[in-house]
Each structure stands twice: as structure tokens, then as C-alpha cells.
Amino acid sequence: MPAVLYEARDRIALITLNRPEALNAFNREMHQQLREAWLAFREDDDLWVAVVTGAGDRAFSAGADVKQMGEPQEERPRPSFWETRFGEDLQSGLEVWKPTIAAINGYCLGEGLTLALACDFRVASEQASFAFPEVSLGLATIVGAIRAPRVVGLGNALELLLVGDRIDARRAYEMGLLHRVVGHDAVRSEAEALARRLCRNGPLAVRCTKEVAYRSLGLAFDDAVRMGESMRRLVNSSEDAREGPRAFREKREPKFKGR
């Protein structure tokens, strides 16, 4: 049975973490297959938005598979002071400029929470719970500690990262971690509805705007403007940039093609 399911439908990629018997915990196979899924989505010009969720009705992902931590690991380079990313995927920095949505249908812990934070939108069940429990196991959280403050602010991030206790969906929404909280059975449908709404917009304009929003966080304002204006010129020369105003004048829905 594949550890990750991948389905393409109506401009939307549906990615499912598929280890429900282990609460969709990450093992080596899931890491590899999830990376392949993100790459397939990124490179497919016919797909404009991705939704990632967990199989079953108990968990988005319970994080890293602790049982596998004691198993022999593949040979890796000896640690050095100058560390680099190993096995890059979405949560650790794989660049995907199309919109991504996490449909959180239960436990969202550790690496599962890091994956959710790497997505642009987070829709959660009212029964979902969230935590970075690594510190309770004597383990450090690295990528989650980098991503969390950018989403929920430093104070809220430290509550999650250093205390390690679970919080419910209501508290997560108050923190700004979640965009929407819905009934347990409505998580996937709500996420897919959001994906369809995003697909109504010009995909090149959406990707450009997302990339500018993220990249500008690390730039001086003037440098960010220069980068953004360069990207905008490329988008404005596209067929979609002509179709949008034309459709507005003709009082009809635009038919964007992503080119």
C-alpha cells in the first residue's frame, strides 16, 4: 500500500498521507513519496492548487514515526558545523509557488504540524489538536521552530515549541494558526471549496503574488519592490493578463489558461 496517495482532479492535486494505522506518522517511505507528490504537482502546469490531508478520521499526521527512530539509518554525511538540508521536501524548503492547503482532520503533531505550517492555508476539524511534543522526548524541533514564529508570532510559537502540550482547534484559531475551523466531516469539502475558489483566479498572478509575499520577508523594502516589479512585468506579458481585463469589459468570467 502506498504511503502517499496522489490524485489530480479539476486543476487540483489531492495528496493524502496514507498510514492511518500509524496515525499517518512519517517514515522513510512517506517522506520519499510525499516529496515525489509535491514535485509532480509543482511541475504539472494543468494543476493550480494542492490539498494535503490524512487518511482516516483520526489524524492529519502524528509526526515522525518514533518506532522507526531506533532502526538503522541510511548512511549520511558526517555532521559538520555547516549543515545543509538533507532530503528536501515542502516542510523543509522545497519551493512550490502554487497555493497549498492543509486539510487537518485530527492529530497534527510534530512533523505533521511543520507540514501544515508549510502550507499557505490551514482548514481544520473542530476535533483537531496540535503540538510540538519533541521536547518531551528530549528532541529538538528545528524546521518547526523556524516556521512557527512566521505564522503565529514568536510568543505563541514558543508556547507550542517549548511547553510541548497539545492545544485544541479553538486555541489554534486564536493564535492565527488556522484560517478556518469546521465540523469534523466537512474538513475536506471545505478545503476543496477553497481550492476551487483559488482556481478562479489567474494562476500566474497567484504564483507571482505568493512568491513575492514569501521572498520579500527576507528583503529590504526597496529590494523587494525591485524583485516584485520584475516578476510583475513577466506576468503582465502573459495571455492571462490580457484575458482578465477583456472578460471584465465583456461582463463574463475569465477563462485563464496559465500562460
Regions found by a protein language model. Give the residues of each.
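Short glycine-rich anion-binding loops that position phosphate/pyrophosphate groups of nucleotides
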Residues: 56-58, 106-107
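An acidic, glycine-rich surface segment that forms the CoA-thioester-binding/catalytic face
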Residues: 32-39, 43, 66-105, 145, ...
